[in-house]
Amino acid sequence: MIYPEFPKKGDTIGICAPSFGVGHKLEWFDLAIETLNDAGFDIVETESVRNEAFPSAPADIRGAEFNSLFADNNINMVMSASGGDYNIEMIPFIDQKLVKSHPKWFAGYSDPTSIEMLLTTVLDIATIYGVNAGSFDWRPLHKF
């Protein structure tokens, strides 16, 4: 099992929308980004994150955006913006060779479970079944 280096203050988290975008709740999502920034992380969002559409973009676009975060050596961790119902559609567009050669933590819960299953069981990369990026909108953060 590959355990990527855990992100630390000053690292960059890439956020993608493999299912739903967050356009319907931008105020809350902006608060979540602010919380992550306040915790010391830089944030990079893919183009579809702030879309209102369900899904956030066609499956091939969502897959390409996911791949771009793993290809970027400046990104230390990848998180799903939110849950939804459409992650399974983008699985065929995940470049497994690319992801395996650039292992990073991927975090999300609910619909992102399908991505975590692929990364953990097929690519042998540990993942985090935990909050999506949009879940950091609590002030103060809940103690887990």
Where are the model-predicted features located?
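ATP/NTP phosphate-donor binding region
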Residues: 1-74
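Active-site histidine-anchored catalytic micro-motif
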Residues: 55-144
